[in-house]
Amino acid sequence: MNKKDNIEKYSDKEALDFHTGGKPGKIEIISSKDLATQRDLALAYSPGVAVPCIEISKNEQSAYDYTSKGNLVAVISNGSAILGLGDLGALASKPVMEGKSVLFKRFADIDSIDIEIDSKDSNEIINCISKISKTFGGINLEDIAAPDCFIIEEKLKQLVDIPIFHDDQHGTAIITTAGLINALDIALSLIHI
């Protein structure tokens, strides 16, 4: 049975058209501040931006106050285990990572950016993610083949000071637990009838 049988029917062309309609892809970056005047632009960039830069240099935690860091998640993959498709490579995983980013925005109002790392080397991936981690409030690892996904997650938890969410592991555990809780609720309600 094809996975498409479980959802509303659509053609391959419709799926491709969805991704190319309007601006290609599914995400964009917009300003959270009004940029209507030259003064607004001067505050957003130079020279006004120097003030929060200095504050963050004195206290890195203030980045959560002056930047989007606290509401910004990186969705990261190397494309080695894309959904049910397998290893299609880093760039082929981009539509999935963009899709996860829009889910973060739609259901939790969390800003997210997709990052595709063109490497199968766990140490290289760990190094890359650890070097960019200060930009984000959290990291979501997605569609990275086992056992590398577990190695990457464990090492990153030791190296960085932000949450590391391994979607294929933690997401499955959360969904399974939710299913069990709901099944118990139903079973208990039937017992009490």
Regions found by a protein language model. Give the residues of each.
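Conserved helix-loop functional segments at active or binding sites
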Residues: 181-189
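A glycine-rich, Thr/Ser-enriched phosphate-binding loop motif common to dinucleotide/cofactor-binding enzymes
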Residues: 165-182
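N-terminal ligand-binding/catalytic initiation module
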Residues: 2-164
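Conserved small/polar residues in nucleotide/adenosyl-binding loops
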Residues: 191-193
